[in-house]
């Protein structure tokens, strides 16, 4: 079982090698447009906290962000594409961790019988209740 999970979809390796991971079939113009929209015009996940999304595809892109101290660090930007074609994204380790778990357990979205329903949640960190993070929960 453990090798099954790691060989299904190795997100970290693909991001390290190419800077991006995508489950979208980009062999068509429609697929390429979906990737473009997800990377450039997605609704922030923070805007849909508490809502249920029917996820059909996932894109994770390595991006550079500036910290409060002015340092530039790399973070994963995760984009979720829903069954109605909408795209939602967040630069959040919590969402990225949830997506890795989803892919590890459920496999590549092309193998899903139907879109996966998730709820966007915002939670406080364990160490400091002032800092919050986004995550996904299954419905």
Q: What are these model-predicted stretches?
A:
Residues 25-27, 89-91, 106:
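N-terminal start-of-chain detector that recognizes signal peptides
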């Amino acid at each position: 079982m453990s090798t099954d999970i790691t060989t299904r979809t190795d997100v970290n390796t693909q991001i390290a090698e190419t800077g991006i991971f995508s489950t979208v079939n980009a062999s068509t113009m429609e697929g390429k447009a979906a990737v473009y929209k997800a990377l450039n015009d997605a609704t922030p996940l923070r805007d849909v906290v508490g809502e249920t999304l029917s996820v059909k595809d996932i894109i994770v892109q390595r991006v550079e962000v500036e910290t409060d101290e002015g340092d530039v660090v790399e973070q994963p930007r995760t984009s979720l594409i829903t069954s109605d074609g909408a795209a939602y994204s967040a630069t959040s380790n919590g969402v990225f961790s949830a997506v890795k778990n989803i892919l590890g357990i459920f496999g590549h979205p092309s193998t899903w019988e139907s879109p996966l329903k998730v709820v966007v949640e915002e939670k406080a960190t364990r160490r400091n209740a002032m800092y919050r993070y986004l995550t996904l929960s299954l419905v």
